[in-house]
Amino acid sequence: MDAPDLEALVRELADKEAIRELARRYAHHVWQLEVDALVDLFAEDGEMDTSLEEPIRGRPALREAFQRLVDDDEADLQPFVHNHVIELDGDRASGTAYIDLRSVREGRSMLGSGYYRDRYVRRGDGWKFQSRGLVLRFFVPLHDGWAEGEAAED
């Protein structure tokens, strides 16, 4: 492998690792309820779409939405990110990051699973989320389970 090929490979590996770290930090800051740190992971015009409401656009709106989540006593979210697939395209990239989600709602243990459809952009201070779209496959009470007719025994 000649030097230019090696340099390109190292750049690709470094970019992919930086993007994986972006997704890990997102989960970490959700766990730690760190609103400002969460918002900083997004580009200035970044967007979050949970499919539960209209997409949230721009850092001020993201800050407000994340703060509401932190202030909600029922919003005990614990995401685990894994199986991250990334496609690079210069200073842009796209990816899918799968999540398992634990939470408590109305005093009940909840379990969720799904994935994020992400678009990333490289800025002067590193990789940022341009957009993050959450697709939940299920989010159910642990006791009920997610397969029809397979609720846990009392």
Language model features with spans:
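Short, low-complexity N-terminal intrinsically disordered segments enriched in polar/charged residues
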Residues: 1-28, 32, 36, 40
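Hydrophobic (often cysteine-bearing) scaffold residues that line and stabilize catalytic clefts
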Residues: 15, 19, 58, 112
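A solvent-exposed, acidic/Ser-Thr-rich amphipathic alpha-helical stretch
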Residues: 35-101
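Short, surface-exposed coil-to-beta transition loops
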Residues: 79-81, 111-116
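Short beta-strand edge/turn micro-motifs at domain boundaries
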Residues: 94, 113-143
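Short, solvent-exposed loop/turn segments at secondary-structure junctions
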Residues: 100-102, 134-135
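Short, cysteine-centered beta-strand-loop-beta hairpins and adjacent loop/turn segments enriched
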Residues: 102-109
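Acidic/histidine-enriched, glycine/proline-rich intrinsically disordered or flexible terminal extensions
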Residues: 140-154
